[in-house]
């Protein structure tokens, strides 16, 4: 019986008429596939109910953040919001590859009108006035509302005390009825666009007037305190960011120092005052662009568990505390760290001895702030007494520790808000190319001061250039007279005058090409040619200086030599060896002849050493020859002429030594010192000694030579116009 019932049921399932009955019962908006299913865009049981599925309501943000959803019976479509444009069809659905992209309205010319600037935002844009102009609508406005940027009538207001006072009072009056949080929000908004000097002053005064105490914020929620502190940090950033430097520089230096100090002091104190609103341990960080802040609030007994340090963009600071004698665990303690990335230029180091005397370069150049300014403050030092502060600051410009002097300093200011940099209580612990580490025994605003050897030399660049030009003109005149002398007078012709003559010719060519071609860098090939000629003739001059030293050494030591053989070798060495060096250098690195600024050898890949190397070698050889010659001459005079006093002997040798220094080119050793130390002193010594080398050679080899004096006497004696002068 059971089997008969099962067979009957199974056969009913296989009955095709049954499937037909099911499909006939489906809703008009449903499809039949064994069962009734509502079509896409509808929802229900498929038989009695298939109503429209409103995707715009059931799937939040189905079209994405930048599009509107429009529902219709059985479906939906998306449209981009105003301020966005579709990269496909105007109407689209999710996941069909279409997206909404921001329209940059600022690409349209003069979108905001004359004397204004367009700022594109995601989905919109906004306008602000250019510096020197103002709008009745405020710092930000939309165009086509009758708003024009007109010339700011108060652009010079900061120079007049009465005008400044009126503007400050007007600003304060507008904020009289605002709460602390509302005031800081308004200041942030008003300072977010370009400011004039008088507005910088006005909004700093507005911030200072926001007197805070714990009662003002104790009832605020954590979120409200966070928002207020954020508005404070952004307001400070708006006042000191890089774009505002040009306006700060228009303010009198003393007044500028006063208001910057006031701002630093207020930012620190108000942040600590606002942190009193936190009822639980809190960590907070605000990044506002050029100003960043980190804040820690905790109970005093938890101080050891909380890191009293901050690391911000490669700058770090850490506080070391000691145990309080009378511990007070009531209330909370806050520690705030503030870093100002661009304020250093506004706090120019004073010329007081406490700062300026630290550098051996300071007397010749400017001391600069070469780091961000970092500040640290504690709300209650009685519960958290300070031991010391250690910090590492990143240099604004990389330094050479061997040439640039850095010191750890802090901004010391009085209750009258007048401040200056001081070194008291701070020591430098470590320095490298990019960072300086310090340790101080107090809290305040810290920075790294630097006196740069290169910066000092730049200050003397024009003077050194004029000395070089004048010296070379004088040297060229003197060298031409030397060449005439050694070439014209036959009675003085010998090996020594031949060497003198070739040395003078090489120096003349080198200095002449230097004078007319060193700055001709506009045409690369011509500049490379000038650099190659300078390389050759300066090396030739050094080679003949070396020959001077060797020849004098042979004479003093008393070596007998073949004059003809020696002459041939002298010429080969004097002109051949420089040619070999230049040929090899040009083959291996021809592209390093000439730079974008001067027609000389490039320092890339140490190519400059193709000149410095041979020059240093010759200087060392001549220094050795110089020492031997002076020693031999002194001993010879002492033995052969005992009647001459020791003092006279030394004085005679000194005169000869000075002459030899210039003839042998030993003064070029100042160039080596300049490369090693690059100080103002070595720059002047090198410039004076070498641009006037031709003049000194003329004085010592011609003017002070008795034989040449006699030759000139005979020459002028035969000239009637000059004879009377010689009588």
From Swiss-Prot:
Compartment(s) of residence: Cell membrane
Gene Ontology cellular-component terms listed: plasma membrane
Topology Extracellular: residue spans: 20-467, 518-535, 590-609, 676-682
Signal sequence segment: 1-19
Region (GPS) residue spans: 408-456
Topological category with respect to the lipid bilayer: Multi-pass membrane protein
Site residues by UniProt (Cleavage): 443-444
Domain EGF-like stretches: 52-90, 102-139
Domain (GAIN-B): residue spans on this chain: 282-456
Disulfide bonds, paired cysteine numbers: 56-69, 63-78, 106-118, 112-127, 408-438, 426-440
Description of post-translational modifications: Autoproteolytically processed at the GPS region of the GAIN-B domain; this cleavage modulates receptor activity.
Membrane-spanning segments: 468-488, 497-517, 536-556, 569-589, 610-630, 655-675, 683-703
GO MF annotation: an example: G protein-coupled receptor activity
Keyword list, A-Z: Calcium, Cell membrane, Disulfide bond, EGF-like domain, Membrane, Repeat, Signal, Transmembrane, Transmembrane helix
Membrane topology (Cytoplasmic): 489-496, 557-568, 631-654
UniProt-listed PANTHER family: ADHESION G PROTEIN-COUPLED RECEPTOR L4, ADHESION G-PROTEIN COUPLED RECEPTOR
The protein's assembly and partners: Heterodimer of 2 chains generated by proteolytic processing; the large extracellular N-terminal fragment and the membrane-bound C-terminal fragment predominantly remain associated and non-covalently linked.
Record's function text: Orphan receptor that plays a role in vessel formation.
The protein's name: Adhesion G protein-coupled receptor L4
Native species: Danio rerio
Gene from which this protein is expressed: adgrl4
């Amino acid at each position: 019986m059971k089997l008969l019932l099962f067979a009957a049921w199974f056969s009913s399932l296989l009955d095709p008429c049954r499937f037909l009955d099911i499909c006939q019962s489906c809703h008009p908006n449903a499809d039949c596939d064994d069962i009734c299913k509502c079509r896409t865009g509808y929802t229900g049981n498929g038989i009695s109910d298939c109503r429209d599925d409103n995707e715009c309501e059931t799937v939040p943000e189905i079209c994405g953040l930048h599009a509107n959803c429009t529902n219709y019976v059985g479906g939906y479509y998306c449209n981009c919001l105003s301020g966005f444009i579709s990269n496909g069809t105007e109407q689209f659905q999710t996941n069909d590859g279409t997206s909404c992209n921001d329209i940059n309205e600022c690409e349209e010319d003069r979108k905001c009108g004359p004397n204004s600037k367009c700022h594109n935002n995601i989905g919109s844009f906004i306008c602000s006035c250019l510096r020197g102009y103002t709008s009745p609508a405020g710092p930000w406005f939309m165009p086509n509302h009758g708003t024009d940027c007109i010339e700011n009538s108060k652009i010079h207001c900061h120079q007049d005390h009465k005008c400044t006072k009126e503007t400050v009072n007007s600003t304060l009056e507008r904020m009289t009825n605002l709460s602390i949080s509302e005031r800081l929000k308004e200041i942030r908004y008003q300072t977010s666009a370009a400011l004039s000097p008088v507005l910088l002053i006005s909004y700093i005064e507005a911030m200072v007037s926001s007197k805070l105490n714990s009662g003002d914020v104790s009832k605020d929620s954590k979120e409200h305190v966070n928002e207020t502190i954020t508005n404070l940090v952004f307001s400070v950033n708006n006042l000191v960011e890089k774009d505002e430097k040009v306006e700060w520089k228009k303010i009198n230096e003393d007044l500028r120092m006063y208001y910057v100090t006031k701002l630093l002091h207020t930012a620190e104190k108000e942040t600590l005052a606002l942190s009193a609103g936190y009822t639980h341990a809190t960590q907070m960080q605000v990044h506002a662009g050029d100003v960043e802040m980190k804040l820690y609030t905790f109970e005093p007994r938890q101080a050891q568990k909380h890191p009293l340090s901050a690391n911000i963009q490669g700058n770090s600071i850490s506080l070391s505390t000691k145990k309080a004698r009378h511990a007070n665990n009531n209330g909370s303690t806050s520690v705030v760290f503030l870093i100002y990335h661009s304020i250093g230029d506004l706090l120019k180091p004073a010329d007081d001895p406490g700062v300026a005397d630290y550098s051996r370069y300071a007397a010749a150049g400017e001391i600069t702030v070469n780091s961000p300014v970092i500040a640290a403050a504690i709300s209650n030092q009685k519960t958290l007494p300070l031991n010391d502060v250690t910090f590492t600051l990143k240099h604004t410009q990389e330094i050479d520790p061997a040439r640039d002097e850095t010191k750890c300093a802090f901004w010391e200011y009085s209750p009258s808000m007048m401040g200056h940099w001081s070194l008291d209580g701070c020591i430098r612990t470590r320095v490298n190319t990019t960072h300086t580490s310090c340790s101080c025994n107090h809290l305040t605003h810290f920075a790294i001061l630097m006196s740069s050897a290169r910066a000092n030399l730049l200050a003397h660049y024009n003077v050194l250039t004029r000395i070089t030009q004048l010296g070379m003109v004088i040297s060229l005149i003197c060298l031409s007279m030397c060449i005439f002398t050694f070439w014209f007078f036959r009675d003085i012709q010998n090996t020594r005058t031949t060497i003198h003559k070739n040395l003078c010719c090489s120096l003349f060519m080198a200095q002449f090409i230097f004078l007319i071609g060193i700055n001709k860098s506009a045409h690369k090939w011509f500049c490379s040619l000038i650099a190659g000629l300078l390389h050759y003739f300066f090396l030739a001059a050094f080679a003949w200086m070396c020959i001077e030293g060797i020849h004098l050494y042979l004479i003093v030591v008393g070596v007998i030599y073949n004059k003809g053989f020696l002459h041939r070798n002298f010429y080969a060495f004097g002109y051949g060896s420089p040619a070999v060096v230049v040929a090899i250098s040009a083959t291996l690195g021809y592209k390093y002849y000439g730079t974008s600024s001067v027609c000389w050898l490039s320092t890339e890949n140490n190519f400059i050493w193709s000149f410095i190397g041979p020059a240093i070698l010759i200087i060392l050889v001549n220094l050795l020859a110089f020492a031997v010659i002076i020693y031999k001459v002194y001993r010879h005079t002492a033995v052969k002429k005992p009647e001459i006093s020791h003092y006279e002997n030394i004085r005679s040798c000194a005169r000869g030594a000075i002459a030899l220094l210039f003839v042998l080119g030993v003064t070029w050793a100042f160039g080596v010192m300049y490369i090693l130390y690059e100080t103002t002193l070595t720059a002047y010594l090198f410039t004076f000694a070498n641009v006037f080398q031709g003049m000194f050679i003329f004085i010592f080899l011609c003017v002070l030579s008795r034989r040449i004096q006699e030759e000139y006497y005979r020459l002028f004696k035969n000239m009637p116009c000059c004879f009377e002068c010689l009588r």
